[in-house]
């Protein structure tokens, strides 16, 4: 279902009408205007569990991977290595996101291949002060 939806969305970014009859979706003449300013459209980061083959195969076809429930840098390194094998052009720019709790050192994740570090606040303890603290720590 997701693969089919992504194919429709990325085709619609061309600005040309998209006609599609698939297993899950049917669209006739859909297009997105204005087209994305970035050639090729908006970067797509695919989320998935590290080490699971299907999300990694899907992520390899797009511009980034956002692993969920990442527990340690080794998981990320294994996923990055597998993505390098799966991608058509492993040398092309590619984003790998590490979402980590506040106070977690992002350096081991960067060494494992993360290109983005997002602070993952606990949903049940989110506060404005906690967010301000992280911003203050990151910006000096």
Describe the predicted segments one by one.
Residues 1-140:
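Active-site-adjacent structural elements that line small-molecule/cofactor binding pockets in enzymes
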């Amino acid at each position: 279902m997701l693969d089919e939806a992504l194919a429709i969305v990325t085709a619609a970014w061309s600005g040309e009408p998209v006609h599609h009859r698939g297993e899950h979706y049917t669209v006739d003449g859909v297009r997105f205007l204005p087209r994305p300013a970035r050639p090729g459209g908006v970067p797509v980061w695919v989320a998935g569990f590290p080490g699971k083959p299907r999300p990694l195969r899907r992520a390899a076809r797009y511009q980034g991977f956002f692993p969920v429930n990442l527990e340690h840098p080794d998981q990320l390194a294994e996923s990055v290595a597998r993505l390098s094998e799966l991608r058509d052009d492993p040398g092309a720019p590619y984003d790998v996101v590490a979402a980590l709790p506040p106070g977690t050192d992002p350096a081991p994740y960067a060494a494992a291949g993360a290109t983005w570090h997002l602070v993952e606040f606990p949903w049940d303890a989110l506060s404005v002060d906690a967010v301000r603290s992280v911003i203050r720590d990151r910006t000096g």
